[in-house]
Amino acid sequence: NLNWDLWLGPAASSKYTSQLHPFNWRGWWDYGTGALGDMACHILDAPYKTLGLHYPTDVECSVGQVFEQAWSQNFVPKGCPASSIVTINFDKTEKNDSKIQLVWMDGGLRPSHPEAIPADDFLGEVNSTNGVLMIGEKGVISCGVYGLEPKLYRKGKETIVFKTPDRSNLDYNHHMEWINGIKAGYGSDEYKKITAPFEY
């Protein structure tokens, strides 16, 4: 059973609707933060860990519009944008000696297919709309959510497919990493493994 009033928390009181719970709450500012807040912690883990990213130097955002009919924009201020592009810039890190630009796209927006990746290869995981492209001077690394199915593409060279641990085991998934980090306590080795700690 769900205690609806408790679930609403500090948000304005409203009647229960299946259009909000159990899934779509993510797209409303009173309850969630849109696709970026919902999925970035799973998708951006790979570049954050691989490149040693910390806080950004600056962020720029552009959002898509929704039209109900010709030239009539549907603006819903309580709802997160239907699509967005967020450009996040970082200074060089201990793992990368040049500045890094990270571009987040959601709502069906996708980057151009890099030349180094064969046209029939998925960007990220097979049959998934989510993924990561890390584009460097010598090649491209692609992976899916949670860093799964990583591949290294280098122009004119054979694709390298990396093995990743099976994360279907309950002892080794993002839920348990988060719980173990909390149990071990702030500043512990387990806590430091969490790429998005709640230190703010």
Regions found by a protein language model. Name each.
Residues 3-189, 193, 197-198:
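Glycine-rich, aromatic-lined ligand/substrate-binding cores of catalytic
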